[in-house]
Design a protein with these regions (language model features):
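Short active-site-adjacent helix-start/loop capping segments
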Residues: 57-59, 81, 94-97, 145-148
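Glycine-rich, mobile lid/loop segments that gate access to catalytic sites or pores
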Residues: 111-117, 133-216
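Intrinsic disorder/low-complexity segments
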Residues: 118-132
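Glycine-rich oxoanion-binding loops at beta->alpha junctions
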Residues: 57, 61-78, 182-196, 201
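Short, conserved beta-strand segments within well-ordered enzyme catalytic domains
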Residues: 48-51, 73, 86-89, 137
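N-terminal amphipathic/basic leader segments beginning at the initiator methionine
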Residues: 1-65
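Alpha-helical support elements that line or immediately flank enzyme active sites
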Residues: 90-118
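Residues forming anionic-ligand binding surfaces in small-molecule and nucleic-acid pockets
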Residues: 82-89, 216
């Protein structure tokens, strides 16, 4: 695993001790990655991917505002109950981007589904199962009203998929969480586990948020 030190080398970041963060555990069936598409122009991680090769149940709570991002509109349109991939980009919220923002997601989804399908065909399982466009959802955070950086994100997708890994430790969870940050001063992670019936349920939380104006 390579840690991108540029995630932490900026004026707004306040380095925290590792002990301040909870130790998130490995989640079976989940692969994660975080890379730089150079959206900030400084090489820090700005794309994160959560991939469930066998699929995962999906639920969401979203804004009640009538003005939503093209990313949220994409997710709402298909009424998904299960997914295989969630890609998160920072720097650009894909809001007030109109047709360009919508078409950008179409391009990214087509390319990401193709690359993930190719990955599966080369896996030890040797599966030929297709990762479909409708198996993917997206999250975008950052500034509004700016053209969505589709070409930079598209060019970074092969590296994003190549860097997927199944083994997760605290440092890797923090790397992925750092790839979502905008003006946040540090990554945000949380962990809890409960016994449900006879089973141990692990709950890992990764979040971002800073300087939001009346979020709803």
């Amino acid at each position: 695993m390579t840690i991108n030190l540029k995630n932490f080398l900026n004026d707004k970041t306040k380095m925290s001790k590792m002990g301040e963060f909870q130790n998130l555990k490995q989640i079976e069936g989940l692969e994660m990655s975080s890379v730089s598409a150079d959206l900030y122009g400084n090489g820090r991680d700005d794309l994160s991917l959560f991939y469930f090769s066998k699929g995962a149940n999906y639920a969401t709570v979203t804004t009640t505002n009538t003005i939503i991002s093209e990313t949220l509109a994409w997710n709402n349109f298909s009424h998904k109950k299960s997914i295989k991939g969630l890609m998160v980009n920072t720097k650009n919220a894909n809001t007030f981007t109109g047709k360009q923002g919508k078409e950008s997601l179409d391009i990214i989804a087509k390319n990401l589904s193709r690359i993930l399908t190719l990955k599966e065909s080369k896996s030890e399982r040797g599966t030929s199962e297709t990762v479909r466009i409708k198996d993917l959802i997206f999250a975008s955070t950052g500034v509004i009203g700016e053209e969505f950086p589709v070409d930079q994100i598209k060019d970074a997708l092969p590296n994003l998929v190549e860097k997927l890994r199944k083994e997760h430790n605290k440092l890797f969870w923090l790397k992925v969480a750092s790839g979502m940050m905008t003006t946040d001063t540090k990554p945000k992670v949380a962990y809890e586990e409960i016994i449900f019936g006879d089973e141990l349920v692990k709950i890992c939380g990764v979040a971002k948020g800073s300087g939001m104006i009346a979020p709803n």
